[in-house]
């Protein structure tokens, strides 16, 4: 999926002129962390407990461990997504975001369970999923925090249903994402 702002602006312009754009520039904008979180929650897609805050504000919630993620963009560098186990770590991450000019953060509870990556096409039977731990599939190496997947049983059909629901809410018919399958088999989408 395109991420460069100039490329997205060009796609948006072409789309507005009537060109066929498979994953809409508007949908790509919806996948920026803050709007993505808001849309997934609004549309009832199973998602971690989340808080959206200004990086200038103090984090007052008691939700640890957690993930602190830049809210104004996709993760571009490793430091855009950080794991925190206490308030001091969250405050240090927010301070780093402020120094880098990042105005908003999304804080997600850390979900215990098996990390699953998936890819699909909304409205079709195409859906592929896998555990990233055995094949060392990683963007920034943070998947190791969830550890090696235990193979918790879950409904692939339900994950496909929820993924298609997310794709529709975000307006991205060709998609990929991450979820965590909890001990009871419930998948919750944490990235799309």
Q: What is the predicted function of each stretch?
A:
Residues 40, 61-79, 102-116:
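ATP-grasp fold ATP-binding core
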Residues 83-170:
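Phosphate-binding site of ATP-dependent enzymes
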Residues 1-54:
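Conserved N-proximal alpha/beta basic substrate-recognition cap immediately N-terminal to
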Residues 39, 53, 82-86, 120-121, ...:
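Short beta-strand-to-turn element immediately C-terminal to the catalytic PLP-Schiff-base lysine
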Residues 27, 55-58, 71-75, 88-90, ...:
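Short acidic/polar capping segments at secondary-structure boundaries
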Residues 167-192:
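Conserved metal-phosphate-binding beta-hairpin within the catalytic cores
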Residues 30-35, 76-78, 138:
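Short, charged, surface-exposed secondary-structure boundary motifs
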Residues 66-69, 118-120, 185-192:
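A short beta-strand motif that forms the metal-chelation/ATP-contact edge
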């Amino acid at each position: 999926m395109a991420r460069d702002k100039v490329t997205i602006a060009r796609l948006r312009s072409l789309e507005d002129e009537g060109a066929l754009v498979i994953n809409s520039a508007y949908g790509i904008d919806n996948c920026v962390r803050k709007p993505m979180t808001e849309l997934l929650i609004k549309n009832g897609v199973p998602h971690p407990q989340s808080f959206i805050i200004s990086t200038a504000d103090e984090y007052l919630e008691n939700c640890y461990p957690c993930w602190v993620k830049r809210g104004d963009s996709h993760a571009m560098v490793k430091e855009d997504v950080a794991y925190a186990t206490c308030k001091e770590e969250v405050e240090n991450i927010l301070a780093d975001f402020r120094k880098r000019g990042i105005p908003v953060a999304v804080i997600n509870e850390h979900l215990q369970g098996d990390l699953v990556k998936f890819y699909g096409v909304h409205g079709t039977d195409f859906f592929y999923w896998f555990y990233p731990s055995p094949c060392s599939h990683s963007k920034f190496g943070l998947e190791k925090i969830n550890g090696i997947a235990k193979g918790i049983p879950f409904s692939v059909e339900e994950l496909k249903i929820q993924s298609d629901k997310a794709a529709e809410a975000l307006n991205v018919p060709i998609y990929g994402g991450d979820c965590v399958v909890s001990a009871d088999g419930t998948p919750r989408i944490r990235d799309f």
